[in-house]
Amino acid sequence: MVGLCACNPWEQPEEEKDIPLAIFKTFWEQMDKHYTCFEEHFVNWDSIYYTNISQVNELQNTEDLVPIFQSILNTLKDPQLWIGVPQKASIQYRLNGSLESHGITTAKGTDFFIDNKNNEYLPSHQIYTLRLSHKCEDREFHFAYVSALSFRNKNATIYKPLLEQVAQLQPDGIIVDLRYNNKGEFPTMIEFVRQFYEGNRPILYTVQRESEENRYNMTHPEPYSIDGEGTVPDSIPIIVIVNFLTFGPANVCAYILQALPNTTVIGQTTTSGGGSSVSGVSLTHNWALHFSNDVKYYVNWHCCESPLHLNVLVSESSAIYEEYIIDGHKEVLFIDSSIATAINLLESMIPWKTSPLGIFNATGRLVE
């Protein structure tokens, strides 16, 4: 997607026909010197040059560079890459898809989750109680739902008291929904994840380039350790839900939580990104480039720029209806398939006294 101002930022004097070539060469050279994720994105950077240079040589206007740069950025699939003319035009890899409504509603159509429409950037949470039965045993099942809608800096102080409130209610499990996270900042995401563990632990490893001459010569991994606050006891099972809209800090958040005890990540494959630091350089003729200047790895040695490796794959969310006993009352609920899977997984972790191992649905029926 390319935004243009009313005055064409690529307009140039007729005699300066070599400008597109100069911009392309400068772009390629700066990426070759500084970019760190060629291997992670399976891109042969020399091939990118030789594939495009003939076409660039024939260009008459800088505007004609747009589809070439867009194709290159789409190949790299790195949302942190940006090239353009500051304040005038930009070219960037953009995610496809639109936000969808999600959650649980009653059959009557009333909202069962906290309404987020007027609170777009703030987290929401709710506690649900389901009554489960099997043989001679009845028990209540409490689960918490936490939707981390944003990791913007203004939310940095919100998550701890919210999770303290959740933990005080001692739920049987917590569902953390990252599917609709509106990006944000790395420090706010870290403030969120450190509530789920206690003590000092490495959560990421950073690798940088050792020189500009060799794009594949990298430093030894340096651990990035953060003290956890342990607001949520690690004895509480956590189900994290993600999908293709989960990228940037939310993707990193899911990876870090996945490495903690008692955590399962479900849903659809994430888009990636979010862990690497970003730098910018000036190109020629007022063009600029922003890029990732390091590579971060999780404790399982998966790259932050890679889509998350799911524990449980759930087909794209679809509407299903199930009958639940909630606070002693029977209700028919609409639940998307990812949340339904999360509930079933949490139910399977309940220490039933009389039942064999298995997964129970909300009415206590054993799922073979």
Protein language model annotation of sequence segments:
Residues 6-208, 216-218, 348:
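Flexible, low-complexity junctional segments that flank or bridge functional domains
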Residues 1-5:
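Sec-dependent bacterial lipoprotein signal peptides
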Residues 8-25, 144, 173, 182-368:
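C-terminal "post-core" interaction segments
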